[in-house]
Amino acid sequence: MNILILGSGGREHALAWATLQNPKCDKLIVAPGNAGIAQIADCASLDIMDGGTVVTFCEENSIDFVIVGPEAPLAAGVADDLRGAGFLVFGPSAAAAQLEASKAFTKEICDAANAPTAAYAHFTNHADARAYVEKQGAPIVIKADGLAAGKGVIIAMTDAEAVAAVDEMFEGAFGDAGAEVVIEEFMEGEEASFFVLCDGENVLPIGTAQDHKRVGDGDTGPNTGGMGAYSPAPVLTDAIAEKALNEIIRPTMAEMARRGTPYQGVLYAGLMIKDGQPRLVEYNVRFGDPECQVLMMRLGAQAFDLMHAAADGRLADTQVNWGDDHALTVVMAATGYPGSYEKGTVIKGLDTLPEDSKNMVFHAGTTLSDGAMTATGGRVLNVTARGDSLAEAQKRAYAMVDQIDWPEGFCRRDIGWRALD
């Protein structure tokens, strides 16, 4: 099969790495890709937000299957354009992608499906939202309604922070994403990610993970797109996962189908778990980044078969073969991230690292410049390892981190602490 993956981050590098292990993959193209992906697959310069351009590319390159990595092209309807042209595609329609693209839409679906989630209010008016947070008080959660690259959520621990967050959103800090705001109760507990594949009708759980949002050790500092992750997440026990499936995910999928917008692709449920009860924090309509990297490390070649079955409506007779293993990824970021950071710094030492089924460095923000690997993003590398235990995976990952010569980079040194302490 000729396969096209859309995207350019560490998530897409991990998807490409797993896909290439499957013998069904004859040719793999990633668009636009990055310097790390270019070492294992062909990369194409393509505007992945333009469905027509992507369709033409698929026709010209005899593509059999398209995997859409990021959320923005899904919300823009690229999967719809591809399906309309007769291509098999992994990723939801624009209508179904509203589960991530609009926080208010998700809340409405949860209400209809009776899925446990935080109490909330939805605002389009600045003064009303301000009055609401002043009345409710902190702690409270303020979310930009639209897509904000995973950064449009502010957990306000004081009344002043809450008011400032509302002001910031309505004053345009998150662009159009913050034109509408959802304000939620603050949920206590431990957060974990639950990943399922959906084919429009059936739901297949494919793994759990826990990421580390804060920039600093001990979960300190501002939120980021994620500084590391591990899988499985011990807090998401089989019993809690079953509860989440029956009380949250399956009712959501049934409600989406009832509305005529069946969901096809991966659904990532962010869950808050307290006293054995899961509640929905948010849905994402794509693999998490960096959670995808640890899931792919554990799934390997079968990941492609699972995605293909979801796209083809065959999940009813598909199963996941899990090993009793653990994976952990450490994000190396440019100093200054998530604020302003320097671009173009040189990374050395990558070519001495092992690359196999237990050790892999996935590239997130790199470019090859005059033969040198350079950092071009905030989150730059995902140093990923697999082991029989989480402690082994952690040790292996940090051993690789310590061999990377990049003075302008940094990472957290405690990824996995919740499960290991």
Language model regions located:
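Active-site "cap" helix and flanking loop/linker of ATP-utilizing ligase/carboxylase catalytic domains
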Residues: 245-267, 284-356
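ATP-binding N-terminal substructure of ATP-dependent carboxylate-amine bond-forming enzymes
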Residues: 1-94
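A conserved helix-loop-beta module that forms one wall/lid of the active-site cleft
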Residues: 90-152
